[in-house]
Swiss-Prot record:
Pathway, per record: Amino-acid biosynthesis; L-arginine biosynthesis; L-arginine from L-ornithine and carbamoyl phosphate: step 2/3
One record GO biological process: argininosuccinate metabolic process
This protein's name: Argininosuccinate synthase
Entry annotated with the keyword Transmembrane: no
GO cellular component terms attached to this protein's record: cytoplasm
Tagged with keyword ATP-binding: yes
Residue positions binding L-citrulline: 88, 124, 128, 176, 185, 261, 273
Residues that coordinate or bind ATP: 9-17, 118
PROSITE patterns linked to this entry: ARGININOSUCCIN_SYN_1, ARGININOSUCCIN_SYN_2
The reaction(s) this protein catalyses: L-citrulline + L-aspartate + ATP = 2-(N(omega)-L-arginino)succinate + AMP + diphosphate + H(+)
Residues engaged in binding L-aspartate: 120, 124-125
Intracellular or extracellular location(s): Cytoplasm
Amino acid sequence: MAKKKCVLAYSGGLDTSVAIHWIKENYDADVVALAVDVGANDKDLEFIRQKALSIGAVKSYVYDARKEFAYDFILPTLQANACYESKYYLSAALSRPLIAKLLVQIAEEEGADFVAHGCTGKGNDQVRFEVSVAALNPNLQVLAPVREWGWSREEEIDYAQKHGIPVPVGKENPFSIDVNLWGRSCEAGVLEDPWAEAPEEAFEWTVNPKDAPDEPEYVEIGFEQGVPVSLNGEALDLVTLIERLHAIAGRHGVGRIDHVENRLVGIKSREVYEMPAAAVLTLAHKELETITLPRELHHFKLGLEQKYAELVYNGLWFHPLKEALDAFIKKSQETVTGTVRVRLFKGSAFCVGRTSPYTLYSYDLATYDKADKFDHKAAKGFIDIFGLPTKVYAAVQKSKA
């Protein structure tokens, strides 16, 4: 009988390194490792690939998914102005369905019996991975070694040392950190006390606003049908634009987020995020929509944006409702073309100008000077008709009093 096979989402860290040996030992399965680059620039993917093989993986894939992540995952979320609980721009939550998609793809190519991830049993990511896999291939079984073994950090290190698995050397980072192209998240350690101020060592992409430059910096972001296409007049692909905007806004302390969020699994968790580009691009996109979307479309879209964020946060990227919302949002972006000017200063991003060839803002109708072309006399009839239901209701109530 052929040996079973498992495709593991591999990061190169201790958890997933131990998981390679643990899956082989407990499931008698060959392990295929898959490392996905979603914009964590500090990772040497070739080193990670070789490390997986040295530990015992029969194959080790690395995949540069930055472009796919930017255009197929970040962009739809940006166009939806999705921000979970009005604070979190969904960085880690966005990468999980992409990694799950690639896991399923490799598993199908390899004829694998399982896929596996390195998530704990306490967080949202286990849900995001497993629900995404179920949506894409309901016949694939998902293994969660870290959730199954339930070891302490010390027990995990003991297992690694016993089986010759490399253990990180040096002072252990007190925080749990996740990085991708869209943002950096930080939790655990002192951050578990919601009263404690986040220390500066929790931040890496942004300067403390008090130490930011004493002069503001202005950036101009160009959009075509809701897609950011230029920064300060220079045409850029989305990956490069996001990376540059991180650097520019980060040096002004923009994009720091301290959030106690409601996790899907039922607990509240305190996270610190750094998302400079996400903060600026979402602000700019919203501002461009204010002048390019008709009122009814704009208001209806505003009502959907929080639901979209919840679907993504909760791991329902491949859900039919989310896909239906994508179709609506794509249609809404047809006229979202133009340029937005944003001022960056001491931790704040403030829109100071917006222009579009499709602008619905009419100076002649909005002005109060002599160029005013608004028909003031028409207001009386409009008010009478608009207020008629209220007037009728009030009259009936008064007659019954």
